[in-house]
Amino acid sequence: MDYEALKDQWSDVEDRDGIRLSWNTFPSSRMEASRLVVPIGAVYTPLKEKPDSPLLQYEPVTCKAPCRAVLNPYANVDVRARIWICPFCLMRNPLPPHYKDITESTIPPELHPMSTTIEYQLARPAPAPPIFVYVVDTCQDDDSLKALKDSLIMSLSLLPVNALVGLITYGTMAQVHELGYTECAKSYVFRGSKEYAAKQVQEMLGLASGLRPNMPQQPARPPLGPAARFLLPVQQAEFQITNVLEQLQRDPWPVANDKRPLRCTGVALSVAVGLLETSFQNAGGRIMVFTSGPATEGPGHVVGPELKEPIRSHHDIDRDNIKYYKKAVKFYDNMAKRAANNGHIVDVFAGCLDQVGMLEMKNLANYTGGHILLTDSFTSSQFKQSFVRIFDKDAKDNLLMGFNASLEVLTTKELKVTGLIGHAVSLNKKSSSVGETECGIGNTCAWKMCGIDPASSYGVYFEIANQGGPAAVQPGPQRGMMQFLTYYQHSSGHYHLRVTTVARPLSGPAGDPTLAQSFDQEAAAVLMARIAVFKAEVDDGPDVLRWVDRMLIRLCSRFADYRKDDPTSFRLEKNFTLYPQFMFHLRRSQFLQVFNNSPDETAFYRHVLNHEDVGDSLVMIQPTLDSYSLEHEGSQPVLLDSASIQPAHILLLDTFFHILIFHGETIAEWRKAGYQDQEGYENLKVLLEQPKEDARELISDRFPLPRFIVCDAGGSQARFLLSKLNPSTTHTTGGYGGGVTSQIIFTDDVSLQTFMDHLMKLAVSGTS
């Protein structure tokens, strides 16, 4: 099968099952697997939308303990004997009584060959409706606070009618608003400079009395404990909550000109976590933190109140010149673990031109499946539109967000799972599917994600099991299998289970060509990028770049065709040719190069990379570039190269985080002269409008909303484009063929051509 046909096949599998594998044939021995260089891995999007597949309204049929695999199309079913054989453990299981009518021609949906992904609505109702706690920073100017209040009031109408809502505001002090008290505005105040233990928070809010262990609790009803004073159903309390929000004032504490406002983000957060963990353990909830500056007092503060003391930079972190960093990270990580253990999500939204301490707070979202959003202000359309998108709904008017989610992976005996890289924490569950090595969050076959949405994607890594001695070859084609079980609380109030079962052939004897042909370079690049970013969190930057280079050289040595020590003979098969340039752009990307980005921005970019699927992640690693000119109708994809900058062309760059329209020198002059508004120049007007329309389409369904930049050749904003291009024409090389028609880039970075020359030289020398 040729590469294009294989790509279409992988794309169909991704549409149906939300999964892409780095290798679509599994090696049959551990030795063979070690020579692959790129690990066997899957980028899996559990809740990928499947509008055409049915929601099964009954409990799944599972194999006996300890296996617990769910009945799937790969199971052998004997309809006469009413038994099925589990493909994971080969145990025989009786079919339940309500399957008595099945025949070869009438089978239940979960056995249909195309039902490799199926979703069940479980009978178990959620213990409480979804909970939303808004944690709002009041140390901000009036315009920003008003815009934020408007966004929050608007969001109340987007919540499910039974959702519980709470409000905590903070500045110099943290205040928990007692929304259930209608006589007047009433709140409990916590001192911003003091650290409160979980027990103290519960006692001060009067929640401890609600912890009577034998209190009868009706399912799907909130526990009618003391927390009901602070968390009210939105339908019943929309008026009160709106009133409280409208009356919110800027923090009254005076701020001197040379000082930052005193802001106790850590106290507000610990109160929110304490409030939910007392009464709503393992019930779906979201703590949404809106901050307009760094925490400057109390636990978790990231900078002092003196303005002359700058917030830490990457340079400070490298030199270990970080006064507050370690203590703050320890505090927020502890909060994140508490929230994750209870199934609660934490989102952090920043509306501030300066850093807010996102680097220290990042694990609040990374451990709990929350969102991180960095914007310049809450008045910006980037914040307003991104915030609304969080509350997107499906055709049945249910929120497209799952709560309290967990993922379990089962494998057949040939495979073992080595870990997961994505927004989750380990559930420390051991099984026969757990591998010996560790990649990412390992030593477990189950993870808790808490928050999950239709775009949430996870990198799951596998190894080939160590078979002792020569295994007896079974008759028929051999295959390895994996099953992904995603449990989550649906916003309709029920638990759902999404099951995806994957089977792939095992390779034949050593040197089987099907192994190399099964390599999906796009999925592999994304899985390797996740490992590189995971390493970058703990290792030095240069070490990570060396690891990326070493892996690329080894992969090329193993799979390219060449004569030893002859770089000119180097050839890669079609399904490997793009991989080196993905790695070239990954090395230069903001995920691994921190120069020109603040630590907060680096944390944000890495967070988003670990959330998206293969397609969107590739746009982040290697942005797309389209060119528009009067000679061609519509857009033409062009190389991400400085040679693509031409005076009479318009370029549209999509980096996922930025969408940029760049006018070449001549086009910019024509536009400034106003030719597009004159008669006879309608084609120029159309040309100027076209990239804007295409940009609008790109922005339409993206989260977070990208920054939109329009610039001209030579303008200061053009740096966003120049920094992404392969510098094939620099001040040292001049243009192609001596004529300088394209842009010259002033940089010492190597070009893709130089990079490839070095790669070929090293790969054919066999010294790696």
From Swiss-Prot:
Organism: Aspergillus niger (strain ATCC MYA-4892 / CBS 513.88 / FGSC A1513)
Subunit structure: The COPII coat is composed of at least 5 proteins: the sec23/24 complex, the sec13/31 complex, and the protein sar1.
Its biological purpose: Component of the coat protein complex II (COPII) which promotes the formation of transport vesicles from the endoplasmic reticulum (ER). The coat has two main functions, the physical deformation of the endoplasmic reticulum membrane into vesicles and the selection of cargo molecules.
Sorted UniProt keywords: Cytoplasm, Cytoplasmic vesicle, Endoplasmic reticulum, ER-Golgi transport, Golgi apparatus, Membrane, Metal-binding, Protein transport, Transport, Zinc
Keyword Transport tagged: yes
GO molecular function, one term: GTPase activator activity
Subcellular location: Cytoplasm; Cytoplasmic vesicle, COPII-coated vesicle membrane; Endoplasmic reticulum membrane; Golgi apparatus membrane
Designated name of the protein: Protein transport protein sec23
Binding site for Zn(2+): C63, C67, C86, C89
UniProt family annotation: Belongs to the SEC23/SEC24 family. SEC23 subfamily.
Record-linked PANTHER family: PROTEIN TRANSPORT PROTEIN SEC23 (PTHR11141:SF0)
Main location: cytoplasm
Entry keyword annotation includes Ribonucleoprotein: no
Membrane topology value: Peripheral membrane protein
